[in-house]
Design a protein with these regions (language model features):
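Active-site pocket-lining segments that scaffold enzyme catalytic pockets across diverse folds
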Residues: 1-34
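Dual-mode signal for accessory low-complexity, basic/Gly-rich regions
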Residues: 7, 31-212
Length: 212
């Protein structure tokens, strides 16, 4: 289980994989996945630049185009790319108002308020449903390939046994492939709107845990 303090990293990996610049460069494991299931049907992801008081809210993107709320993944099915003018031109598509401009750098596609919608069960219910597993509360380092989806990260947290939290775990490694991981996600209902990229606590089955 990814606690909501760290689950936004999964949403971030999805955003990077559907970034138009990565699609145009042919460097994303989701490059051929438009209108196809990429995640469990419990997963919907929305980019909402018009959310009131959202940390990433703005009416116009870094190239002056009007922004709009976009459902990017709907019930697990990929519905769109994040595009600026350059990546849209390379892909022969219309820009989507997702250009972000940094100080001294050219515009590039990016998210605004990137939200993985909550599920129907509580975090405690997710924990109680696990016979043996790992509650991840902190991530340490990263080895994630957006080309292949291969995923390996250091993590710490707590061991779960018989649906109950046991002792602490430090310096473990969790590994899998994002293609498989996304298909095995169950979201909790504990979404917390405190950042511009947010996700609820997530149960992901079938991952490898070493060093716990």
């Amino acid at each position: 289980i990814y606690d909501r303090r760290v689950s936004s990293s999964i949403a971030g990996h999805i955003a990077s994989a559907i970034n138009g610049a990565a699609i145009a460069r042919d460097t994303s494991f989701l490059k051929d996945s438009m209108d196809s299931p990429i995640a469990a049907d419990t997963i919907t992801l929305v980019d909402d630049p018009l959310r009131p008081r959202g940390l990433g809210s703005s009416p116009f993107d870094g190239e002056g185009l009007a922004r709009q709320r976009r459902v990017m993944v709907e019930n697990g099915v990929l519905k769109g790319w994040f595009l600026d003018l350059a990546s849209a031109r390379q892909l022969g598509l219309a820009p989507t108002g997702n250009a972000r401009r940094g100080a001294g750098s050219p515009p590039s596609p990016g998210t605004t308020n990137w939200i993985m919608e909550p599920g129907d069960v509580s975090r405690d219910e997710l924990i109680a449903s696990i016979e043996e597993g790992f509650l991840v509360t902190e991530m340490i380092g990263s080895s994630v390939s957006l080309i292949t989806g291969d995923y390996s990260r250091g993590a710490s947290g707590f061991w779960i046994k018989g649906g109950e939290i046991q002792g602490p775990v430090t310096e473990a490694t969790i590994a899998g492939n994002l293609k498989d991981m996304l298909m095995q996600i169950t979201p909790a209902n504990d979404l917390d709107f405190t950042r511009s990229t947010i996700a609820p606590s997530l149960r992901i089955d079938g991952m490898t845990v070493a060093g716990a």
